[in-house]
C-alpha cells in the first residue's frame, strides 16, 4: 500500500518508480564522487534546478541537518565515508518525497559504528512514515531493525512473517528449504577433531 493505494502497478523505469514514491539505494554507490554532496542530491532532477549555488547548498544543508547526517553540502562526496555516502543517497530519496525506500545490502561494506549510524537514520525515517524494504543476508541485523521478514528462495516467495513469530532457527529452515530435524542432523554431522596418541609423524615434507 502506498498512500492507501492497493492497486498493482507496472513500473518500467526508475523515473516511473520515483513518481510513485519508490526509491532505491543500491549496494554499490551510484552517486558521483567528484561532485559535491549537494550536487549529488539534486543532479538529474528536473524539479530541482538551481541557478544559485548558495541557495542549493543552503537547501541541501537543511536536509542533511534535519536527518542528522554528518556531512556538509559543499564538501566533495569522495571525502565522505561509505556510510555517509549512502546516507546522502537516502537524503536524496527523502527529498524526492520517497514513501517506500528500498535498501539493497546497505551494510555490506560498513563497520559496526557505521551500521549503527545507518540504523539510526532508518529508525528516524520509519518514525516519519517512510516504509523501508531492507535487503540483507545479515540475520542479526534483520532482527534488530525489521518488523517483518519476507523470505525468498530460488526466485520464489516462501512467505512473509512477523519478526516476533519467527525464531531464527525457523528462519534458517525456511531459507534453506529444510525441516528443523534436518538442520539438527546437519549440525550433528559436523566433523569432530581427532588426535593421534602415536608420536610417529603422519606426514613429512623436505626441501620444499
Feature-to-residue mapping (PLM):
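Glycine-rich phosphate-binding loops of nucleotide-dependent enzymes
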Residues: 1-208
Amino acid at each position: 500500500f502506498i498512500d492507501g493505494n492497493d492497486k498493482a502497478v507496472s513500473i518500467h523505469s526508475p523515473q516511473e518508480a520515483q513518481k510513485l514514491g519508490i526509491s532505491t539505494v543500491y549496494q554499490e554507490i551510484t552517486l558521483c564522487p567528484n561532485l559535491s554532496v549537494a550536487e549529488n542530491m539534486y543532479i538529474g532532477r528536473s524539479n530541482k534546478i538551481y541557478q544559485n549555488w548558495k541557495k542549493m547548498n543552503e537547501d541541501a544543508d537543511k536536509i542533511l541537518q534535519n536527518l542528522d547526517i554528518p556531512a556538509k553540502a559543499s564538501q566533495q562526496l569522495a571525502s565522505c565515508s561509505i556510510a555517509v555516502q549512502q546516507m546522502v543517497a537516502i537524503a536524496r530519496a527523502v527529498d524526492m518525497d520517497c514513501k517506500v525506500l528500498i535498501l539493497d545490502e546497505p551494510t555490506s561494506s560498513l563497520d559496526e559504528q557505521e551500521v549503527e549510524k545507518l540504523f539510526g537514520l532508518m529508525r528516524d525515517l520509519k518514525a516519519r512514515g517512510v516504509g523501508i524494504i531492507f535487503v540483507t543476508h545479515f540475520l542479526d541485523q534483520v532482527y534488530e531493525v525489521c518488523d517483518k521478514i519476507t523470505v525468498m528462495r530460488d526466485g520464489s516467495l516462501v512467505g512473509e512473517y512477523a519478526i516476533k513469530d519467527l525464531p531464527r532457527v525457523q528462519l534458517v529452515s525456511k531459507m534453506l528449504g529444510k525441516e528443523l530435524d534436518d538442520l539438527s542432523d546437519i549440525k550433528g554431522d559436523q566433523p569432530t577433531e581427532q588426535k593421534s596418541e602415536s608420536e610417529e609423524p603422519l606426514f613429512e615434507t623436505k626441501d620444499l
